[in-house]
């Protein structure tokens, strides 16, 4: 099942601030995620206290997203370094 991807405005800005090599790697991982969600389970972890929110690990960076299985949509909520990504995520 192929998911559609939607970047929230904040996530798009955060991605633009990351160095180009990591941007390309993050985009590649997101593409793999949309094409075959089940094959990425080793890099995914559900967020505690947040239903249908997950984090995707890409090196030192994390991609936080919401998966809507009914509409087959993945909404990218936040992208950032692992040290700071969770600080103001609510």
Located regions from the model:
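Arg/Lys-rich, positively charged N-terminal/basic patches that mediate binding to nucleic acids
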Residues: 1-29
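Enriched for short, Lys/Arg-rich terminal
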Residues: 2-4, 9, 13, 58, ...
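Conserved short hydrophobic interaction patches
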Residues: 29-32, 82
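A short, surface-exposed loop/turn module that caps and links secondary-structure elements
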Residues: 31-56
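NAD-dependent ADP-ribosyltransferases
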Residues: 63
């Amino acid at each position: 099942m192929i998911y559609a991807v939607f970047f929230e405005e904040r996530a798009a800005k955060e991605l633009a601030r990351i160095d180009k090599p990591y941007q390309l790697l993050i985009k590649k991982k997101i593409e793999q995620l949309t094409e075959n969600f089940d094959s990425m389970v080793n890099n995914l972890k559900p967020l505690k206290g947040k239903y249908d929110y997950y984090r995707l690990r890409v090196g030192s960076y994390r991609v936080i997203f919401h998966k809507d299985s009914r509409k087959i949509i993945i909404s990218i909520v936040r992208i950032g370094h692992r040290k700071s990504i969770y600080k103001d995520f609510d």
